[in-house]
Amino acid sequence: MKVAVLGAAGGIGQALALLLKTQLPSGSDLSLYDIAPVTPGVAVDLSHIPTAVNIKGFSGEDATPALQGADIVLISAGVARKPGMDRSDLFNVNAGIVRNLVEQIARTCPNALIGIITNPVNTTVAIAAEVLKKAGVYDKNKLFGITTLDTIRSNTFVAELKGKQPQDIEVPVIGGHSGVTILPLLSQIPGVSFTEQEVADLTKRIQNAGTEVVEAKAGGGSATLSMGQAAARFGLSLVRALQGESNVVECSYVEGDGKYARFFAQPILLGKNGVAERKDIGKLSAFEQQALENMLDVLHKDIELGEKFVNQ
């Protein structure tokens, strides 16, 4: 099993690489790539951790050596949010980075499962899909926008509010991965109920949690460590599914039947070929139904922006 992390020298990439080095199955290969010259050194640093995970680092313009033979590619490359920016401000820089890296994936390991972390995810996943399509290698069951951070934040905030153990809570989060497109389905948590005010406040906090971190870091960065953990959780779920484990379910932003939007975050059953089944989002409360309808314009525009970027 080979996992490649692109953007491995950044805040998310280093945290993700550390978690994968300690948690990937024995005998796995982990390859780190970043344009930054420090990347081979990050790999050497991590190589001293005593786990049976082989690690190599690559830097420079060409990601090909890192991608050769990869089963899973996780992309965190790009610029991070600063105070006053929203995820869409990142578009101008990150769109080009994602296009370039996905073109290299299409040439080098076209059958790999691809997880996109680089924001704005609503748009960068659409860019990746169009690049793969142009190259003639697009499989919608193998491309994922990693929205796991919304899930782990929801789990944490609900557990805090209700005095529960966070590991006992699993909140499905649907829609997209920015602002109003993030919709935690709080009505679907077994044995936990909320007042209308709690639902409104929690939903808003989950939607704005990224900004909470950006402001708390006072210009020194964005959510890198929690995002690293979220990406590791999702990446390790992909590994377990590829190895044949059954009933591996994660919420992820994928191309589906287009009922709400071309790309939509929903619970996904993972399997040996990526998406095994897009699970139904289930029954929504009136609040959730309204929030879903209200987000769709934004989501459609985000997706269209990515499609146009590649096809203009």
From Swiss-Prot:
HAMAP family: Malate_dehydrog_1. GO terms for biological process: malate metabolic process; tricarboxylic acid cycle. Keywords: NAD, Oxidoreductase, Tricarboxylic acid cycle. Belongs to the LDH/MDH superfamily. MDH type 1 family. NAD(+) binds at G7, A8, A9, G10, G11, I12, G13, D34, N94, I117, T118, N119, M227. InterPro entries: L-lactate/malate_DH (IPR001557), Lactate/malate_DH_C (IPR022383), Lactate/malate_DH_N (IPR001236), Lactate_DH/Glyco_Ohase_4_C (IPR015955), Malate_DH_AS (IPR001252), Malate_DH_type1 (IPR010097), Malate_DH_type1_bac (IPR023958), NAD(P)-bd_dom_sf (IPR036291). Catalyzes the reversible oxidation of malate to oxaloacetate. Substrate binds at R81, R87, N119, R153. The active site is at H177. Its EC number is 1.1.1.37. This is Malate dehydrogenase. It catalyses: (S)-malate + NAD(+) = oxaloacetate + NADH + H(+). GO terms for cellular component: cytoplasm. GO terms for molecular function: L-malate dehydrogenase (NAD+) activity. It is an enzyme of class 1 (oxidoreductase). It comes from the Bacteria. Pfam families: Ldh_1_C (PF02866), Ldh_1_N (PF00056). Homodimer.
